[in-house]
């Protein structure tokens, strides 16, 4: 699991990476032997790395085009960091081209539906490479927040100041899962006219079935990887969140 979900930072060299649309300072990591995949190293608050890691992996397990993602073992005093596969993007195709290209139409709709299911309320960042659309940036999804993780990190201290019930509420606030399917429908069908109502409905039903088909063993692998660097309560939070998505997908 360590090799699969973690980047060995000592094997890479780093340079400052400047781009638009991603928050905070980032670095581009390349293998020191000048080969293999390059990664964008991203950190922006406690919840950024875990949301990117979980969002990208869950999307990939649903068959959505996304970059690979790895966690990085923190050095002493470091922030949480996620390494996201660098994909050099060409100019995005215009909506007219997407509407009339079956492959691009499907990729566009499924990319946005992944953000919908994971309740990522930020703008959907898209990349276009080798004739395919990819999505990224799930940092605002999954109902995870910086404050809750901070409380998890300091639960022993806060546990002496507040009741265990209050501590649990701060660490694991109730998840009110309500994906904005209507907003995505209006955008894709009514506003942008990317697809028909029938296409949207079929795609939503299909991506829900894909989510339900994700094996419990894969979910456990992802959560176990998180607990290598995050407090164990965070895995509990994601477990609750994933179960909420499953409930929605069964309806």
Protein language model features and the residues they cover:
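Short amphipathic alpha-helical segments, especially helix-boundary/capping motifs
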Residues: 28-35, 101, 196-199, 211
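Alpha-helical context
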Residues: 35, 99-104, 180-183
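Acidic-enriched, low-complexity/disordered segments with a strong bias for Aspartate over Glutamate
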Residues: 11, 33, 47, 68, ...
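Short, low-complexity, polar/charged sequence segments that are solvent-exposed and flexible
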Residues: 58-62, 101-105, 153-157
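C-terminal catalytic region of ATP-dependent kinase domains
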Residues: 132-251
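Conserved kinase catalytic-core segment
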Residues: 97-150
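Conserved ATP-binding subdomain of kinase catalytic cores across diverse folds
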Residues: 2-93, 114-121
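Sequence-level detector for tyrosine residue identity
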Residues: 5, 12-17, 27, 39, ...
């Amino acid at each position: 699991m360590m090799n699969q979900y973690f980047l060995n930072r000592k094997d890479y060299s780093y340079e400052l990476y400047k781009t638009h649309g991603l928050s905070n300072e980032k670095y581009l990591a390349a293998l020191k032997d000048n080969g293999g995949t390059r990664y964008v190293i991203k950190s922006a608050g406690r919840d950024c790395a875990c949301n990117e890691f979980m969002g990208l992996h869950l999307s990939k397990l649903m068959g959505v085009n996304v970059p690979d993602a790895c966690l990085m073992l923190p050095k002493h005093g470091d922030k949480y960091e996620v390494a996201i596969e660098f994909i050099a993007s060409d100019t995005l195709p215009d909506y007219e081209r997407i509407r009339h290209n079956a492959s691009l139409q499907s990729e566009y709709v499924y990319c946005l539906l992944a953000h919908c299911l994971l309740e990522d309320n930020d703008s959907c960042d898209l990349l276009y490479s080798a004739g395919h659309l990819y999505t990224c940036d799930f940092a605002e999804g999954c109902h995870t927040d910086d404050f809750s993780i901070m409380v998890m990190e300091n639960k022993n201290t806060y546990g002496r100041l507040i009741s265990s019930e209050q501590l649990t509420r701060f660490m694991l606030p109730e998840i009110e899962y309500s994906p904005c399917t209507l907003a995505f429908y209006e955008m894709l069908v009514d506003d942008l006219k990317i697809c028909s109502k029938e296409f949207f409905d079929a795609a939503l039903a299909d991506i829900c079935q894909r989510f339900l088909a994700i094996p419990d063993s894969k979910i456990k692998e992802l959560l176990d990887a998180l607990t290598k660097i995050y407090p164990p309560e965070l895995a509990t939070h994601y477990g609750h969140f994933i179960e909420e998505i499953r409930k929605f997908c069964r309806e």
